[in-house]
Structures are given as C-alpha cells and as structure tokens.
C-alpha cells in the first residue's frame, strides 16, 4: 500500500508537485530509504547541473526520486526528480551521451535492458537539489 509523504524532511523535499500537479507517493519501504538518505541533511538551492565525474553512486528511491552521491564530498547528496518520473529506473541500466562533463536538467537518459540490450524507455533529469549534512546535528 502506498502512502502520501508526511515525514520530515522528506515532506519538505517533496512538498511540491512532481509534474502536472500530482503528489509523489512512496511505499513505506521507499519512504524509509529516503528518510535514511536525508537524515541530518538540509536542502540547498537547486542546481541545473552537477559534475558527472564526481558522482560515486546513484540510488533509485522510486520512479520519481533519484539520489546521486558525491565522490569528493560525502556530506552532500543530490536529489533529482525526473519530470514525469523515470519508469523502470530501478530495473534497467541508465545510458546517456557524454557531451559534457556534467549531468544536467533536461538531459535524456535511455533505459536499457541488461539481457537483451533493447531500449526500454527514456526519461529526462530534473534539477538537482543538494542536501548537505549539518555537522552540528547529532554531534552533541
């Protein structure tokens, strides 16, 4: 069963509609995974691009929420909400053209089946919202 986001800080992150006015819904498992990633972090101003070479790992929370972890700065993660979602992001390989050294809002991602090599769909990145760990939180 799915539930509307009510927990903080995830509710702050996702208070705005995803696209077309709908509210993003997460399962309890997805919500717990998101809360764990955001624990002790606070949002900063959204960025249209992030350094492609600085990205250590991408975590798929849901079709609507992707998290990018920085290689150089473990305190910061980037939340991306693809406009219209990215159906299959958790099942398929994401492929994109390396035209610059950045991942940018509006960049098209192809979803590729690992076994057949077939393109299963595509989506685009939205803005990247940095969430940075506040070093004073939990250091009492």
For each predicted feature, which ranges?
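N-terminal secretory signal peptides
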Residues: 20-76, 136-137
């Amino acid at each position: 069963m799915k539930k509307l986001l009510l927990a903080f800080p995830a509710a702050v992150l996702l208070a705005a509609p995803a696209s077309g006015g709908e509210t993003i819904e997460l399962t309890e498992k997805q919500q717990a995974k998101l809360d764990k990633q955001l624990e002790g972090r606070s949002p900063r101003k959204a960025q249209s691009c992030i350094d492609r070479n600085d990205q250590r790992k991408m975590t798929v929370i849901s079709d609507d929420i992707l998290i990018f972890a920085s290689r150089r700065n473990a305190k910061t993660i980037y939340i991306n909400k693809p406009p219209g979602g990215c159906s299959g992001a958790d099942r398929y390989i994401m492929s994109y053209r390396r035209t610059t050294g950045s991942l940018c809002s509006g960049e098209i991602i192809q979803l590729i089946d690992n076994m057949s090599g077939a393109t299963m769909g595509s989506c685009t990145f939205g803005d990247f919202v940095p969430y940075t760990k506040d070093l004073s939180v939990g250091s009492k």
